[in-house]
Amino acid sequence: MDHSEIDVETSPLTAADAQAVHRLARAAEHVDQVAPLSEQPLLRLLDAEAPTTHLMVRAADDLAGYAQVDRGAPGTASAELVVHPFARHHGVGTALLEHALELMDAEGRVLSVWAHGDLPAARSLAARTGLVVVRELWKMHLPLDGSTSTPESAPAAPLAPGVSLRAFRPGEDDAAWLAVNARAFASHPEQGRLTQTDLAARVAEPWFDAGSFLLAERDGDLVGFCWLKVPADQPQDAPRVGEIYALGVDPSAQGLRLGTALTAAGLDRLREVGVEVVELYTEGDNTVAIRTYTAAGFTRATVDVQMARPSDATA
């Protein structure tokens, strides 16, 4: 089928549509062994206030493809898309991507697209639409069963004098955490833009545990954090997985080796709650973070890539 003949629907999602997106994402993950959509798009499926555009290609009784465009940053936009395994090689992905590009061109926005797992099909789609890789996001992992070098065999990473750790207090620490997060990730296009609404959505998730959201304080001021995530619905016959969900240090506390100390504290907490494999995501060009995590025993597992048109990447 010519992709120009495919009907791409752009409209807010109904509750039934949101359920269909979840089914579509699960079907693709089952085949590809990589989740096609990250957490943020899934949290925003029914968020009428979110600056997002939803694109759908419908099949007879379900979705053949879905894309979400995040228009929250001035002059730019970021998209994620997924095509059902039964609908691949029929132009669905091309239709979704080209429609998204046309919409953002009309708004004067530069569009980039995430490909989770950097799969051959995504690379092929990018080549057909003239996109090139402009950014890498590494997924790193660490078994806590002793099969690799872990912090248990490395020197301890004590907190700097005057720095203490405590658990996050929902509703009390929100503003302070959002401020530190924005400063720590000032150059990060997603993490640094988190809002109170974004934080509240995550606190409401089944996996949230305030005891696994560690805050570092100095003289009563928040200077760093290590937020951990242990998904609630894990299979019983597989190793229990936990994630260093977000780790940040306020610029005012740089030089205190807080990143190393927070990583060690996070790993200790994950051991306490029975995690056997730890995952995290970090920018491929963040040499400081990669060095910290590598020293803790992490290795690169997979790579997500963000792609854009060459002219946009150099603009």
From Swiss-Prot:
Stored SUPFAM superfamilies: Acyl-CoA N-acyltransferases (Nat) (SSF55729)
EC number: 2.3.1.189
Keyword terms of this UniProt record: Acyltransferase, Repeat, Transferase
The reaction(s) this protein catalyses: 1D-myo-inositol 2-(L-cysteinylamino)-2-deoxy-alpha-D-glucopyranoside + acetyl-CoA = mycothiol + CoA + H(+)
Binding-site positions, 1D-myo-inositol 2-(L-cysteinylamino)-2-deoxy-alpha-D-glucopyranoside: 39, 190, 229, 243, 281
Disulphides: none
InterPro entries cross-referenced by the UniProt entry: Acyl_CoA_acyltransferase, Bact_Acetyltransf, GNAT_dom, Mycothiol_AcTrfase
Enzyme kind, highest EC tier: transferase
Residues engaged in binding acetyl-CoA 2: 247-249, 286-291
GO biological process, alphabetically ordered: mycothiol biosynthetic process
GO molecular function, one term: mycothiol synthase activity
Purpose: Catalyzes the transfer of acetyl from acetyl-CoA to desacetylmycothiol (Cys-GlcN-Ins) to form mycothiol.
Assembly notes: Monomer.
Family statement: Belongs to the acetyltransferase family. MshD subfamily.
Protein name, per record: Mycothiol acetyltransferase
Originating species: Sanguibacter keddieii (strain ATCC 51767 / DSM 10542 / NCFB 3025 / ST-74)
Gene name for this UniProt entry: mshD
